[in-house]
Amino acid sequence: MIILVVFALIGLVVGYLAISIKLSKAKEQAETILLKAEQDAVNLRSQAEHDADHLRVTAERESKAQRKELLLEAKEKARKYREDIEEEFKSERQELKQMENRLTERATSLDRKDENLSSKELALEKKEQSLADKSKHLNEREENVAQLEAEKQAELERIGQMTIAEAREVILTETENNLTHEIATRIKDAEAQIKDTVDKKAKNLLAQAMQRLSGDYVTEQTVTTVHLPDDNMKGRIIGREGRNIRTLESLTGIDVIIDDTPEVVVLSGFDPVRREIARMTLEALIKDGRIHPARIEELVEKSRKEMDNRIREYGEEAAYEIGAMNLHPDLIKIMGRLQFRTSYGQNVLRHSVEVGKLAGIMASELGENVALARRAGFLHDMGKAIDKEVEGSHVEIGTEFARKYKEHPVVVNAIASHHGDVEPESVIAVIVAAADALSSARPGARNESVENYVKRLRDLEEIASSFDGVQTSFALQAGREIRIMVHPNKISDDEVTILSHKIREQIEKNLDYPGNIKVTVIREFRAVDYAK
C-alpha cells in the first residue's frame, strides 16, 4: 500500500514537472512569436515607407503616365503587404488563442488537482494579462500602420494629381505660414521707424519755419500817455469844476488820469480803440487850444471818423505784407480792427500776420499752395474783430463772413477747423492750425493776467449793455466803476434808480471781483433848435 502511494506521488511529481517544462517551452515560443511579429511589423512598415518614398521621388521625376503606373504598382504592393500582414497576424492570433486556451485548461486542471499550485497559477494569469496587453498593443500598432499606409497612399495620390502650379502654390502657402510671424515683426519695426522719421521731419519743419520767421513783438499795454507843452494845460483839461475831463471821459469811456507827473496825462482803458480816440482827441484839443465840452464833443466825433480811416489803412498794410490780394474791402476793414484787439496781451492783427507767414513757410516745405496758405492763416481769427456785435464764437463768425465774401473753400475750412470745431478737409487747414498754435504758444507771446483783466472789464460792460434802454456803457477806474448812458426817451428819471439797482444785482450775481464796483447811470436830455 505504501508502495502504491509512493508511486502515485512520484507520478504526480513527474507529471507536474512535465507540465512545467511544456509551459516553459510554450512561454518561450509565445515570446519568440511576439518578438518576431513585432520585428516583422517594424520591418514591413520601414519597407513600406521606404518603398513609398522611393515611389514618390520616382513619380516626381518621371512623366505623368509613368507616375500613374508607379502609383498603381504602389497601390498593389501596399495591398499585398497589407494582406500578408493581416494573414500573418491572423495566424499568430489564432495560435496565441489556442495556446491561451490550452494553458487555461491545464491551469484549471492543476488547480483542481493541487491547491499548492495557486501561487503559480496567479503568476501565469499575470503573464496571460501581459500577453493580452501585448496583443492589444500589436492591434494598435496594426491600426497605426494601416493609418500610415492610408495617409501615405492619400499623399501619393494628391501629389500625383497635382500640377506644377498647384505644387508651387502649396509650397508658397506653407512658406507664407512659416514666415507670418517674421513678416508681422518686420512690419511692426517698419511702422515704428516710419513714426520716428515722421516725428523728426515734423520737428525739422517747425524749426525751419521758426528760424525763417523773425518777428518783433511788444506786449500791448492798457494805458497811453499824452505829453503836454506845460503843466498849466492840466488845469485847462480839467476845466471849471471838472466839466471838461468829465465830458471827455463820458464820451470816450476812458479814464483820464492827471497826477503830479510833470507834463504828462495818462489815458487808461482796456479798449485800445477808445483809448486811441481819446488820445487823438486830447492831442487835437491841446493843439487847437479851445477846450470846452462842445469842442470836445466835436473832436471826439472827428477822431472816430479818422479812426475808421486808420483801421482801413491797418488792414491794407497787413494784407499787403502777407500778400493777400483781392480781399473784399469789408474784410480789409475787419482785419484792420484787429490792430486794436488783443488776445492774452498779444496783438491779434500781428498774430494773424505771423500765422499767415508761418503757414506759407510750412506750405512751401510741404509742396502746398503757399498763397492760399498765407491767406487762410491771415484770415483765421477775423471773427475776433466782430464777436461783440454778432452772436457766436469767433470761429463761427469768421467762417460765416468768409462764406459771405466768397472766400476759397479751403480758406473757409481752415477758419472753421483751426480750433478743432470741425474736421480739417485739407493739408492747408492742418498747417493753419499748427501755425496758430506755434504763434500763440511760443514763450512771451501771450500774457494771461492781462487777458483776464480785459475779460473782466468786457463782461462788466456786457452786463450793463444787456438792459433795454442803455445807450452805451464804460468800465472805468480799472473796473471799479461802471458808467452807463441811457436813452432819455426810453428811460425816465424815476426808472434810472431802478435800472442802477438791477445792474448792481446782475453784477453781484454773475461776476467775481475784489472790493466794490460803483454803478453810475446817467440820463441826459438835450433840446436843440436853430434860429433862422
UniProtKB/Swiss-Prot annotation:
Its annotated compartments are: Cell membrane
GO function term, MF aspect, one: RNA endonuclease activity
Membrane-topology descriptor: Single-pass membrane protein
- Disordered: region residues: 101-139
Q: Name one GO biological process term.
A: mRNA catabolic process
Signal peptide boundaries: none
The reply on keyword Cell membrane is yes
Q: What is this protein's function?
A: Endoribonuclease that initiates mRNA decay.
Name the NCBIfam families on file. HDIG, PRK00106.1, RNase_Y
Protein name, entry field: Ribonuclease Y
**Protein source organism:** Streptococcus thermophilus (strain ATCC BAA-491 / LMD-9)
Q: List the taxonomic lineage.
A: Bacteria, Bacillati, Bacillota, Bacilli, Lactobacillales
